[in-house]
């Protein structure tokens, strides 16, 4: 049976005028295959509001799968995240000026949640299609990790049938005009997220293949 | 009262002939100040044995503080780790040929442990002394994270008065002769670990200052 | 009057199965605007033959402008080259096994030639179109620099009305599946070279704006 | 017969409070072996004055060998430069506010000068001593390249018996506290320059071994 996939992207932050996560997510809104139908929603780069908005979107769309997407400026690959940690520690203020320091996201939640998405399969599938990808083991401690942890905490408490996860993506080329940083084109990112969504719809379980990072 | 600090380093792995973590740790063996006295032990880069060796060293030395140190080839800063995750996922075999894939380190342990060391203070102190340092939020999924998680699991179950943590360090220059990678001199690393040990001995609690990473 | 632009790309080298310079160049073959008409030719990654092939292509097409293009794996921007040096010093053998060491390309040629293309204008124009670009001051010492120097030496001796230059481009994404390296999509590279060709056709002279590198 | 080696370093620029080239050079002042005796002089990071100061130092010390040294922030190796180009193109103003754009350094000089130092030998010797090193083929277009070109132009016209060259060095650790950049310790840099000076004193000619860069 076809799975409903909710994909979210953030609004721009950290002096950027565009956020490739939302640019890519919105292009996938309404995309359908036999396995998956995608809906996209935008999330504010703001602690607390980010999670409120996500919960409302889940309430509204009743998805089988939730994939939150965020910009990881400086990375050169599409990086599905494996683990979310119970820590908000903001190096810069969010879009409303909040800057939590060493705060727990959920006071009675576990130290970390594992993604429920088949991140090794998704990564392998992207690479088969010529897209640079790697599993990541840290989503940072800013709003991206906050949303990822909050998503996993929410669905584990209220709707354990939903599978959730997070994907970090590089800058798009136009963002790197005045900095020296790697980028991937929006087309490549959109293709990567489409592959991720369909793979997540097709497979509940991940493949057991060597992976990991040395540090 | 003066604190006993156990510092561990690994033997060489991944085709290296030297491991800067052990080179640095052994130079600190016997170092004393008013606040701290350091003992060093070597740990094999082998899943399971690493932790057995560490437990024996803790049994033998009865330290107040344990700081495990490991090589993070490619990093350019001294990076105290904040979180250990319950996952062994080896990209390459360890020094005895074991290559666990997606295994839990402790089947009934939590998803993650936080360090008990004041990593922001340690980082700030290193920077005051002109040493590049940053808190890291991922220790990878190889033997370093395995030892870090295993240490925290062990002391939380058997000896919660011990405070433990992990520091990743860059290559030393001689390791980068035939690769293009950053390095720090052994002298700098030794100084950094000494500062870390003394700071950990002086302060139980960390300082609450902005930090974190965007991703 | 419309300018004839010859764009060349290389065949794959250094264990790659594709060379983005030729993939991009061949897509531009036959492209026309009011200012420029583009012809593409492939060049072997072989000392000597590379230059023979280029001279024949110039003879055949009688271009106004020649833009040679080569892969610079590891760069993250489109980088028009400013200077070619009279040195062949091969770190690896070329595609026919030649590995010249510290050889002059032209025994009675100057130590270096400046490009005749308006590289600052080209770079600025690419950036206006959202493409990461920067002027480069070294084309290396392998076949790319060899062809660039040989081109400039040839036209300065035989056909000074022709304006010539070289552009280095990054890997395309599919080349970075099994390495950690930045890339730009083929579409982005094709657009960049089209902008470069048209800009070179429109402007004989470069703009005088701040640029350069600190080292 | 023992060679007199003049080593120069620059004063700080680009918002830095220290320049590792001068910190290292001044530590070598007076250093003697059977082959070499080193004198150090400081050079201002200012177009024109840099060269005036260098010429006076040459006049005063009557060296056999001149090695100018400069900071290349972001590099991770000691990089003897092979070629100086006849171009001043400043991305930022120098320490007196001059910012030449696309200017020739010497209107009737050649497009480039080759170093007269045995840069491959020097690099190999540093690596034998465990120091990361590589020959570089671009000294940039700022005051470093200006001084290097000016040095070679001066001695080729007035004192061709003097052999000259340039070495770029990384940041030292203290400069990278608030940026993410590689560094080498001052001790390592001092050792590297000492090896460079002695090697240059011992060998007039370079070794013919594979080297070079692909781009």
Curated annotation (Swiss-Prot), chains A, B, C, D:
Gene Ontology BP terms: proteolysis
PROSITE patterns in the record: PYRASE_CYS, PYRASE_GLU
Places the protein is found: Cytoplasm
GO molecular function, one term: pyroglutamyl-peptidase activity
Keywords per UniProt: Cytoplasm, Hydrolase, Protease, Thiol protease
Superkingdom of this protein's organism: Bacteria
Catalytic residues, chain numbering: 81, 144, 168
EC number per UniProt: 3.4.19.3
Enzyme's top EC category: hydrolase
InterPro entries, alphabetized: Peptidase_C15 (IPR000816), Peptidase_C15-like (IPR016125), Peptidase_C15-like_sf (IPR036440), PGP-I_bact-type (IPR029762), PGPEP1_Cys_AS (IPR033694), PGPEP1_Glu_AS (IPR033693)
Family of the protein in this entry: Belongs to the peptidase C15 family.
HAMAP family named in the record: Pyrrolid_peptidase
Function: Removes 5-oxoproline from various penultimate amino acid residues except L-proline.
Assembly behavior: Homotetramer.
Protein's name according to its UniProt entry: Pyrrolidone-carboxylate peptidase
Biological source species: Bacillus subtilis (strain 168)
Gene: pcp
């Amino acid at each position: 049976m076809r799975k409903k996939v909710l994909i979210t992207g953030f609004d721009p932050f950290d002096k950027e005028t565009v956020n490739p996560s939302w640019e890519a997510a919105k292009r996938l809104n309404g995309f359908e295959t036999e396995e998956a139908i995608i809906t996209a929603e935008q999330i504010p780069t703001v602690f607390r509001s980010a999670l409120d908005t996500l919960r409302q979107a889940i309430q509204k769309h009743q998805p089988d799968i939730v994939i939150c997407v965020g910009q990881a400026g400086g990375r050169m690959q599409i990086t599905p995240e494996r683990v979310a940690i119970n820590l908000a520690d903001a190096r810069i203020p969010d879009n409303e000026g909040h800057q939590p320091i060493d705060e727990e996201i959920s006071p009675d939640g576990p130290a970390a949640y594992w993604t429920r998405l088949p991140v090794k399969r998704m990564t392998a599938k992207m690479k088969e299609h010529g897209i640079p990808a790697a599993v990541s083991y840290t989503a940072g401690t800013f709003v991206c990790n906050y949303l990822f942890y909050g998503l996993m905490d929410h669905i584990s408490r209220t709707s354990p049938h939903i599978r959730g996860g997070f994907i970090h993506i590089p800058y798009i080329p136009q963002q790197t005009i005045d900095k020296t940083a790697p980028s991937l084109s929006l087309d490549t990112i959109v293709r990567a997220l489409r592959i991720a969504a369909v793979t997540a719809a097709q497979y509940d379980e991940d493949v057991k293949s060597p992976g990991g990072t040395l540090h």
